[in-house]
């Protein structure tokens, strides 16, 4: 990537930053126009950022022809050039709940009158305006810093971002000065990349090393942070933010207490949220705790702002009522378990698959989880990518017992229609895995596909 921005570093001026060796190679050939620079632009005018991904591509010629900076120095460069408008950076990591927690924090801070940027799975937003479309949960380091520059130019008070395990391991967040780091939970995901659950947990925990404010889930057994200054929130265990009583039948209703580090009760407040499930109660607590730590606003005022949050598209999204149809992004065992737990008082039908070319170890567990809770199960494709949909489905089935109400249909649209055709008025249909994604990846082709649109079209055709 290349960012065309004038920056100063060590008493020198540069017209751009890049972490792509191909940019420097093109400049050496007098072909700077390939990357939007002047054709004969000098390599001395482009600051090259070394990182974990590009270090093996840096040839001696590249090393000798341009100025280089380590990735962890980027934050200092940014602050030196834009320090008068530096926002408070809030990083949220965890297996599940990052997107919803980030969105709640963003919503509450906006309601409290702050200028806020939000970066994550759903894209890049500033003050309710989408700046960039969906991309990686945490983008490349240079794109991340480009987004920070935009937030600074817009005079944002806060920069809320999701932090993936890939980004932590690949050092895409190196050098960032976080005002607050938040943990939602640690279960299991991306074992195709991290190779073991122990390594995955280690990576997640590494985010909380060092100094700085931290807000952690007190009920999470796999957080190993020993920082005595850390804040905690919890449902089962008491923390700085705790639940005194709660109900989940019609959204979230409860009463919460905020305690400072001496654990004397300072504030209490009722809370209401248009969200379903215990997992969303955790997300809500994380968000409330974060806003309290960051702003010191009265707890009741934060709770009032929470009531205006309408949910996240594709996260426990109600697409149809009577019968009830929910679309959600849940694509891990734990994510599915939390959704099923939210509807365990209902008769559940579920449509789901698993992504191809990704962690295969979770597939049997997902199948077993579905069979534990649902009385109708429709196994289909998610984003098969270059894997055979049939082999993915077989992996899911390997974790299940033979059942009369287990149906296999690799075509996702047909599977959804099949489930809708047999859906009874007293059942809830959960369509899991893709959430608000509007595409399906089959082979190397990305085609338009939206679970929600399929459901709406089905019911529209029957009116």
From Swiss-Prot:
Which NCBIfam families does the record associate with it?
murE (TIGR01085), PRK00139.1-4 (NF001126)
Q: Which GO terms describe its biological process?
A: cell division; cell wall organization; peptidoglycan biosynthetic process; regulation of cell shape
Q: Which pathway is this protein assigned to?
A: Cell wall biogenesis; peptidoglycan biosynthesis
Q: Which GO terms describe its cellular component?
A: cytoplasm
Give the top-level enzyme category.
ligase
* Positions with a binding annotation for meso-2,6-diaminopimelate: 358, 382-385, 433, 437
Instruction: Tell me, in a sentence or two, what this protein's role is.
Output: Catalyzes the addition of meso-diaminopimelic acid to the nucleotide precursor UDP-N-acetylmuramoyl-L-alanyl-D-glutamate (UMAG) in the biosynthesis of bacterial cell-wall peptidoglycan.
The cofactors it requires, by name, are: Mg(2+)
Q: Which Gene3D superfamilies match?
A: Mur ligase, C-terminal domain, Mur-like, catalytic domain
Q: Which family does it belong to?
A: Belongs to the MurCDEF family. MurE subfamily.
What name has this protein been given in UniProt? Answer: UDP-N-acetylmuramoyl-L-alanyl-D-glutamate--2,6-diaminopimelate ligase
Q: How is it modified after translation?
A: Carboxylation is probably crucial for Mg(2+) binding and, consequently, for the gamma-phosphate positioning of ATP.
Instruction: State the taxonomy lineage.
Output: Bacteria, Pseudomonadati, Campylobacterota, Epsilonproteobacteria, Campylobacterales
Q: Residue positions of the PTM N6-carboxylysine? A: 204
Residues that coordinate or bind ATP: 94-100
InterPro entries (UniProt xref)? Folylpolyglutamate_synth_CS, Mur-like_cat_sf, Mur_ligase_C, Mur_ligase_C_dom_sf, Mur_ligase_cen, UDP-N-AcMur-Glu-dNH2Pim_ligase
Motif Meso-diaminopimelate recognition motif, which positions?
Answer: 382-385
Pfam families reported for this sequence: Mur_ligase_C, Mur_ligase_M
E.C. no: 6.3.2.13
């Amino acid at each position: 990537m290349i960012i065309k921005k004038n920056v100063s570093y060590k008493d020198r001026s540069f017209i751009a930053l890049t972490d792509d060796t191909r940019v420097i190679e093109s400049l050496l050939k007098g072909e700077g126009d390939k990357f939007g620079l002047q054709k004969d632009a000098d390599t001395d005018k482009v600051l090259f950022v070394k990182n974990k991904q590009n270090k093996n591509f840096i040839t001696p010629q590249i090393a000798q022809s341009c100025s280089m900076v380590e990735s962890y120095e980027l934050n200092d460069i940014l602050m030196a050039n834009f320090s008068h408008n530096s926002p408070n950076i809030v990083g949220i990591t965890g297996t599940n709940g990052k997107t919803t927690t980030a969105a709640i924090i963003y919503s509450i801070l906006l309601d409290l009158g702050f200028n806020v940027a939000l970066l994550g799975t759903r894209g890049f937003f500033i003050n309710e305006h989408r700046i960039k479309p969906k991309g990686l949960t945490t983008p490349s380091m240079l794109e991340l810093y480009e987004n920070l520059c935009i937030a600074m130019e817009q005079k944002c008070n806060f920069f809320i971002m999701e932090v993936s395990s890939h980004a932590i391991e690949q050092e895409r967040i190196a050098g960032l000065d976080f005002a607050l780091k938040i943990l939602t939970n640690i279960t299991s995901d991306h074992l195709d990349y991290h190779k073991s659950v122990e390594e995955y947990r280690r990576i997640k925990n590494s985010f909380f090393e060092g100094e700085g404010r931290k807000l952690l889930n007190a009920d999470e057994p796999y957080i190993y942070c020993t920082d005595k200054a850390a804040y905690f929130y919890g449902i089962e265990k008491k923390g700085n933010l705790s639940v005194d009583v709660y109900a989940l039948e019609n959204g979230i209703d409860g009463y919460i207490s905020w305690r400072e580090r001496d654990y004397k009760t300072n504030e209490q407040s009722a809370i209401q949220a248009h969200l379903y499930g215990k997992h969303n109660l955790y997300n809500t607590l994380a968000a409330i705790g974060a806003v309290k730590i960051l702003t010191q606003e009265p707890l009741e005022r934060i709770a009032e702002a929470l009531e205006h949050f309408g949910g996240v598209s594709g996260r426990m999204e109600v697409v149809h009522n009577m019968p009830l149809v929910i679309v959600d992004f849940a694509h891990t065992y734990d994510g599915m378990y939390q959704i099923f737990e939210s509807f365990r008082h209902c008769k559940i039908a579920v449509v789901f698959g698993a992504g191809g070319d990704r962690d295969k170890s979770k597939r049997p567990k997902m199948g077993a989880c579905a069979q534990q809770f649902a009385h109708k199960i429709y196994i289909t494709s998610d984003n098969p990518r270059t894997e055979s949909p049939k082999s993915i489905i077989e992996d899911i089935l390997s974790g299940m017992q033979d059942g009369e109400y287990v149906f296999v249909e690799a075509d996702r649209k047909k599977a959804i229609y099949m489930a809708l055709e047999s859906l009874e008025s007293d059942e809830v249909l959960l369509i899991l895995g893709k959430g608000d994604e509007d595409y399906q990846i089959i082979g190397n082709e990305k085609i338009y596909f939206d679970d929600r649109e399929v459901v709406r079209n089905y019911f529209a055709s029957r009116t």
